[in-house]
């Protein structure tokens, strides 16, 4: 699977919008910088304004551009709007493993996400900052149980140490890819049977029904 850092010339087969949500200071901007540019800065200032970055990857021999959106500080004013969620087919729901309150707010973020996004959006719960294990305030099992109850993927990560971030994004992007691919195949079948194919020529932003938590991803490593 190609990393695709900084490759702007290649043909793009799919574009998937993925949003990062969660309380302030849980590391969303660092997660974005690490995944999109393989960069990390401890001096990263709070994000202000709309921000998204892209990274292109190869998934099953197709070129997929991930368009990753950061809430850009709006969460501090509880001002994340429906426009932010519009068109998103994936979401990273982030909390800080050293701050219990950020995990306790996850149900509210999930409720807001499901109210504004497509009901079948692919969601990954992320417990960030595993590099601060000695300050852990959220047991892995608590998050794991919540993810299983809500039908979410789940991993613990460290943007600082680049732990599990590739796995987290690739799990979500591959799941979206598989859903869209199935819809395209179904559309082709309908067309061959003389029925109109609503997805003909459209390869982006169409999630499908539900997602299953693979056993290998429904756990964490720190």
From Swiss-Prot:
It is a lipid-anchor. GO terms for cellular component: endosome; Golgi apparatus; plasma membrane. A motif (Effector region) lies at residues 44-52. GTP binds at residues 22-29, 70-74, 128-131. It comes from the Eukaryota. One of its GO terms (molecular function) is GTPase activity. Pfam families: Ras. SUPFAM superfamilies: P-loop containing nucleoside triphosphate hydrolases. Keywords: Cell membrane, GTP-binding, Lipoprotein, Membrane, Nucleotide-binding, Prenylation. InterPro entries: P-loop_NTPase, Rab_GTPases_membrane_traffic, Small_GTP-bd, Small_GTPase. Belongs to the small GTPase superfamily. Rab family. NCBIfam families: small_GTP. This is Ras-related protein Rab11D. It comes from Nicotiana tabacum (Common tobacco).
């Amino acid at each position: 699977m190609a990393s695709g850092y900084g490759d702007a010339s290649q043909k793009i087969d799919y574009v998937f919008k993925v949003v990062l949500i969660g309380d302030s200071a849980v590391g969303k901007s660092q997660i974005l910088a690490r995944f999109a540019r393989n960069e990390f800065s401890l001096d990263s200032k709070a994000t202000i304004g709309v921000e998204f970055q892209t990274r292109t990857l190869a998934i099953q021999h197709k070129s997929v551009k991930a368009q990753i959106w950061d809430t850009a500080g709006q969460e501090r004013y509880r001002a994340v709007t429906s426009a932010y969620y519009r068109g998103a087919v994936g979401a990273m729901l982030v909390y800080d493993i050293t701050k219990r309150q950020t995990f306790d707010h996850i149900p509210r973020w999930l409720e807001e996400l499901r109210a504004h996004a497509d009901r079948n959006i692919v969601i990954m719960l992320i417990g960030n900052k595993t590099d601060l294990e000695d300050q852990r305030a959220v047991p892995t099992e608590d998050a794991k149980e919540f993810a299983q109850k809500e039908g979410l993927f789940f991993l613990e990560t460290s943007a600082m140490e680049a732990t599990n971030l590739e796995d987290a994004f690739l799990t979500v992007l591959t799941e979206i890819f598989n859903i869209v691919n199935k819809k395209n195949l179904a559309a082709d079948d309908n067309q061959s049977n003389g029925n109109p194919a609503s997805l003909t020529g459209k390869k982006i932003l169409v999630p499908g029904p539900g997602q299953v938590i693979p056993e290998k991803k429904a756990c964490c490593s720190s």
